[in-house]
Amino acid sequence: GDNQTLLVWSGEQMRTFYASGMYENKSSQNLLRQIDYFSNKHKHLEVARRMYANRFPGLDMSGMNMNQMRGAEGTRMKKLYQKLASEYNVQWNNRNYKSQDFDAQDDINKALTYGNHLLYNVCHAAIITLGFSPAIGFIHSGSMRSFVYDIADLYKEFITITPAFRIMSDGYHVDLGSDIRQAVRAAMQKNKLLKCVTKDLYKMFEIDNAPETLSTGIWDNVITYQEFQSKTLWGQKNTI
């Protein structure tokens, strides 16, 4: 509290996100702005358009409604999966996510599911750190993590999808979870994920003076108690 530090209760290596604790003097300004934009029909649609515009650079989406944008995104994702499958010579049928039966998925879908969960958890922590609500989504709805899914979708192509196909092109994996975790972590660092999330969130809600990056170190300090004792992270020295 004295150091204004966000505490996150998570599974090992951020595989799951259970809860968080925030210092009591944290400003609610960003949350109130998010609520204002969510409750205003025009502003709500504009936020959604800004999200989709990130994935369609150069395309004028000003006249498109939500269904049209969702349709365009669905087509884009289908083509992306097919392109990467061809590029990395990975067998691909379709995205087959089974939340209740992880083992029923083929290996490429397992890799995508695992990588996406890691991305969700880091985005969740970033959203809370910046004072927004993970539940108030503008494209997704009906979940306590709707906004997490909104934000994570901005970065999946480079953070989880491409690394997953690249990993699968290497052949058999003794520990697929470990391999995809390391690949996603490397992609997050290479693409400066937290800096992008911060910039995009402030741009989305037209907030000036966005911080250069998060000041709470939610990436550097996501460690278990055992890792804290041994001063290691992700199987190597904690020097990130």
Where are each of the predicted segments found?
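Short hydrophobic alpha-helical runs that function as membrane-insertion/retention elements
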Residues: 5-9
